[in-house]
Amino acid sequence: MNTDDGVCLTLQLDIASSEPPAPGSFQHAVLVGKLAFFTALGIPDNDIFGTPIRDFIPRNFKGKASKDAWSSCGSCHNDGLSDGVTWIFATGPRRTIPSDGTFSKQNPQDLRLLNWSAIRDSITDFNNNSRAVQFGCGFASDNFDPGQCFAKGNTTLANPAIYDHGILQGGSDALDAQTLWAFAAVRPLHQPQPADTTAGQAVFAANCASCHGGPKWTKSQIFYRDNPAAVAENGATLDPGVTRLAPAPPVAATPANEFFSFTCNNLTIKYLEDVGTFDISDPLEIRDNAAASTAFGRNGFNVPSLLDINYHSPYLHRGQAQTLEAVFPLHGLGPGGSGFPPTTTIATQLTAQQQADLLVFLKSIDGTTPHFRSEGDDFRDAVRAQGTCPMPPPS
């Protein structure tokens, strides 16, 4: 743009520092997903993959990601990882979970259940955060013009296909792009590598790998019939093998959307594990939406990924442990490892040397570390060998 104030001629140019990916390319779709993840304003829901990245004007779609542009997915998940903060949600106090362990980076069909209480199983489900937490109208609301989103926020009608344990993809191009970005672009940080982790690996293999093995460093994986997995919010599951629990009293009976386990014939994998870290009497274990209503946790917690664990302090579902060393006396292990407080823990079951060796190995885990087999791997292979029930995703 040229401007002339009578004194001098000013020339304004938009000079690209690099050529962005071409519309229609894989790299462009990933970049659009990044924009959708980090904008607190919004982008169009659909017909976005042919639009040059510089042609998106998020302020024209304010009110979609959040009301008054106060928050985005990236506000808590910086770089797609974690801010380390414990927030009070509808399920209770929850430390932000990093997204680097959501997918196996070798297999986009290897997806863990999501949230500490396994109440979701797709990035698409988190459109409900844009609406119910950030008070925007979300990224599946093309039936409303951007002005309505800004004015009405989450009072606009929700897309009926998007709910916890609803569709994995197909809600909108913007949500599918977010999913693509989480798989293709979010990566664990490289950790300092000690000279020798052999001793710690042996301790890990014997005591931790069954839950924290696998390419995502968690056994949590969707094996049940999905997309959607349930007929409606809090509705019946579409796969009879899913055991779905309501939170234990005194928690309100709904939402009853914790996916506790999946059974195929005589084989069962648990998603929620009780490791003795939920104290129902603690006044911090409250939910954000119901007075005197206790948080989820009595049934256990969805096994977290240990990818990059050295970087993601504090630890446990509400950040009770500031360091990995502090986890050991709190985390149940062995015959008395469930219930609060656990009578046997990592600290009581392992010698001081074993704990030191384990700590060295845990701090080294990153995307380059060879993983161990988990219960999830064993379950998948056993179901395949039977040749019954819905076949698990390819490994």
PLM features per residue range, with description:
Residues 1-395:
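Periplasmic c-type cytochrome electron-transfer domains
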